[in-house]
Structure formats: C-alpha cells, structure tokens
Amino acid sequence: METAASFDLPDERVWVVGDLHGNAGWIQVLLPAMRRHDPSLRTILQLGDYGFDHAQPGTGPVDYWAKRAGIERVLVTLGNHEEWNHITAAQEHVPGMAFRVSDVVWLLPRPFRFKIAGREVLSLGGASSVDKAFRTAGKDWFEDELITEQMEADAVAGGPADLLLTHESPASAAPEVQLLLTNNPHEFPPEALAVSAAQRARVQRVSDATLPHLHMHGHMHVYGDLEREDRRTVVSLDRDTFPGNAGVLDLATLAFNPLALNEIRS
C-alpha cells in the first residue's frame, strides 16, 4: 500500500468536487467536462460521500475517466456514506497517513494537512447520517463516520490553515444550508438532528481555531456560500448531477468558480 505523510503540490488551480455517491454515470459526464473546460488541471479535491469502494471490483470509472481528463490525483476527504468497514481497518494499519486505493485516488486520514501552491490545507472528514434510522448498522451505516473529540483536538493542534476541507457543514453555514436545516424537508427524527448539530458544532470549533480564509464542505446536498463578517468564506457544494457539484479553486485568491451544469452536460 502506497502511503503519504503529506503532499506538497505545485498546482495553482485545482478542481473541488462535492458528494459523488459512487455515481459512475456522473463521473463519465463530469470528468470529460472538466477536460473540456481546462485540460491543464491535475488535482481533484473531493469532499466526501465519495462512495466508490476500491476494496471491491467495478470501481474503474474514476481511474478511467480521470486519466482521460489529465487528472493525476483525487484526494478524498471522507464523508459519512463510505465503506468504513474497509476504510477503518486500512487507516488503523497506517495511522495518520494518506493511502492510495487506485491509480489516482487517495483517501485522507482525519485530520490531514498538506500544501497546495504554498497554501496550508486542513482536511477533516466525517459527518453524521441523519438517515441512520433507515440504514443497517455494519451494512450501510457505520459509527466510524463520526468526527471524534480526538480528531477535533488533533485538527486544532496543527495551527492555522488557509483552506479547510470537510464533509460536514459548520454551524455557521451558508443561508441555503441554514434554510434546509430549518425546514427539515425529509422529516429526519430529532435524535438524528441532535447528533448532526453536535457534529456541526465540532466542525465550527475547528474552523474558529484554525481560521481558514476558505472553508469548503459537502454533505448538505445544496450549493451556497457565506462571506462572514470576519472575511472568512464558507462554500457548500451540491451532490452529483446537480448544479454546484464541482468547480475550479484558484489557490492564489482562494476564489471558487462552479462549473455550470449546462457546460457539464453539453
């Protein structure tokens, strides 16, 4: 197993992609669109619910389309809907290390720090499943999904970061995320929402301690952004097949430009 204690990448611009949920059909549309938009980009930062299980056959679409798009690496900040039954054991074998699961895909530990174009990047994967009541423990739900107190402490101990990547939303989230949480359109049970709120508070504490200029997350299945009074920005990416699932991040300015859905599907 190939591992890495960190990365130091020269890329001036990278792709950032939200939830994918193992959707091979979306991959074979999205990655060619990325190449059409800008064939010079080499890195994808994926924000969790990646959903492709590289311990099983049939996960070739990511490597296949990434190579054709000129993508050399996909760095995954893990989400809640992942194959934790395989991932946890692998992480325990190489604690604190990113490990490679395919030609281009790396799964990042929690937390993990690396650099892109001199920027300090902090990745902290994990989140709560508000649909836990409709899932089966050990089959499609795993307690390992949660961000722990130790993970929070380790993330904070590393000091400030320029860019924070999480799957879970912070408590201080984009208006679109706040509206979703207020309305609870899927009528998730109160106990699940309480765990979710605790996880968001944990992420917020990490953000407030590390003071990233930009915090990007997935999980909420809605695109939106928030520019805080302290000039820190939070961006929520939508899920596969929806607008705002992917875009280009400029490391010099930390400006994010989403790839339009009509450009992806053209």
Task: Put a short name on every predicted segment.
Residues 27, 57-58, 144-145, 195-199:
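A conditional alpha-helix N-cap/helix-loop micro-motif detector
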Residues 16-18, 44-49, 73-81, 107-109, ...:
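Active-site neighborhood of phospho(di)ester-bond hydrolases with catalytic His/Asp-centered motifs
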Residues 67, 77-192:
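Conserved catalytic scaffold of divalent metal-dependent phosphoesterases
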Residues 8, 115-117, 208, 221-266:
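Binuclear metal-dependent phosphoesterase catalytic core
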Residues 61-71, 198-209:
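Catalytic-core regions built around general acid/base machinery
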Residues 21-25, 51-56, 80-88, 113-115, ...:
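Active-site environment of divalent metal-dependent phosphoester hydrolases
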Residues 2, 7-10, 17, 24-116:
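Core catalytic region of metal-dependent phosphoesterases/phosphodiesterases
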